[in-house]
Amino acid sequence: MKCYKSSSILSTNHHPFFYKQQPISSLQPTSIPTTISYPTRTRFSSTRIQSRLTHDDPVKQSEDLSFYDLLGVTESVTLPEIKQAYKQLARKYHPDVSPPDRVEEYTDRFIRVQEAYETLSDPRRRVLYDRDLSMGFSFSFSGRRQNRYDQEVVEEKSEWKAKWQTQLSGLRRRSNQKDNNTMSWAARMRRQQQESS
């Protein structure tokens, strides 16, 4: 490949892009043409259109935002500021107040804002989120997914349920013992048989 200098654009009726080139070396090759034409049609138009559509779509834009960016606050924000930002956005994107032609878009945005608020308003979940965010993990929204923060809530509820069931079974046992003291031997045997079957 040869290097050329002093390229200039020449315009004709058929092709707007012709380049007249002069070789740098003193030897002028005879096989290299002095003009090069480029097609007038480019394939970049579809890329530009796609790019513009992506940037014009606020729902697609919000998928790439962190929860802080979604609420429009900084990472050093306080809880009252998070609540205030959430209330403003919830009023703006609530499905009941959305234009009829943008209900789906507003609903998606409202759900994202709700998830951001739930995560950032809970101190434990916020610490986990901040840690993961500082490590560069991506948080793309997938709609009420079971993420790590939700999993912790589920675990807490299951622990609470296990404690509650233990207490309930203890109360039943004491109640049965109290009833057993006032029942006859035959009544206690019938009751045991019913419980075992």
UniProtKB/Swiss-Prot annotation:
Pfam families, alphabetized: DnaJ
Family per similarity comment: Belongs to the DnaJ family. C/III subfamily.
Listed SMART domains: DnaJ (SM00271)
UniProt keyword list: Chaperone, Chloroplast, Plastid, Transit peptide
BP terms from Gene Ontology: chaperone-mediated protein folding; regulation of isopentenyl diphosphate biosynthetic process, methylerythritol 4-phosphate pathway
Top-rank taxon, per record: Eukaryota
Role played: Plays a continuous role in plant development probably in the structural organization of compartments.
PROSITE patterns in the record: DNAJ_1, DNAJ_2
Gene Ontology terms: cellular component: chloroplast; nucleus
Transit peptide: 1-60
Location of the region described as Disordered in the Swiss-Prot/TrEMBL record: 169-197
Protein's gene: ATJ20
Domain J: 66-133
Record's note on what induces expression: Down-regulated by mechanical and gravity stimulations.
Tissue localization of expression: Light-grown seedlings.
Organism: Arabidopsis thaliana (Mouse-ear cress)
Subcellular location, record wording: Plastid, Chloroplast
Descriptive protein name: Chaperone protein dnaJ 20, chloroplastic
Primary location: plastid
PANTHER family the UniProt entry points to: CHAPERONE PROTEIN DNAJ 20 CHLOROPLASTIC, J DOMAIN-CONTAINING PROTEIN
